[in-house]
C-alpha cells in the first residue's frame, strides 16, 4: 500500500506491507469483489468479524487512516485498534447508522 502523509509542510511517502501492520500477506486474488450487492455483503461480513484476506485489507486501510489522523502511533497499533472496533461491533453499528441516514435522504426534498 502506498502511504502519503503531510507533516510540517513535508510530504512523506512510504510503501507499507501487511507485515508493517502486524498482519500476514494475502493474495490479491482473494480481494476480488463483484457487483454492488455482493460488495455490500462482503463489507457487512468483514465488519461483522469475518476473518480472511478482506479483513486484512480493511485493517490496513482503516489503520492507515488512524495513523494519518494521529489516533494511532504506528501501523501495528492502528490495525489493532481497527480490529477492536470491528470485533466490538462498533464498525458495523456505524455502517448501519450511515445506511439509515442515507436511506432517510431519499425522501428529503
Q: Can you annotate each of these PLM segments?
A:
Residues 1-109:
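Glycine-rich anion-binding loops and their surrounding alpha/beta cores
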Amino acid at each position: 500500500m502506498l502511504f502519503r502523509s503531510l507533516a510540517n509542510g513535508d510530504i512523506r511517502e512510504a510503501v507499507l506491507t501487511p507485515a508493517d501492520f502486524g498482519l500476514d500477506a494475502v493474495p490479491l486474488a482473494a480481494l476480488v469483489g463483484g457487483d454492488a450487492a455482493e460488495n455490500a455483503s462482503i463489507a457487512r461480513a468483514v465488519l461483522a468479524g469475518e476473518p480472511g484476506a478482506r479483513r486484512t485489507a480493511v485493517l490496513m486501510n482503516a489503520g492507515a487512516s488512524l495513523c494519518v489522523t494521529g489516533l494511532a502511533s504506528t501501523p501495528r497499533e492502528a490495525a489493532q485498534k481497527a480490529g477492536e472496533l470491528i470485533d466490538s461491533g462498533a464498525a458495523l453499528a456505524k455502517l448501519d447508522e450511515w445506511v439509515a441516514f442515507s436511506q432517510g435522504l431519499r425522501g428529503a426534498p
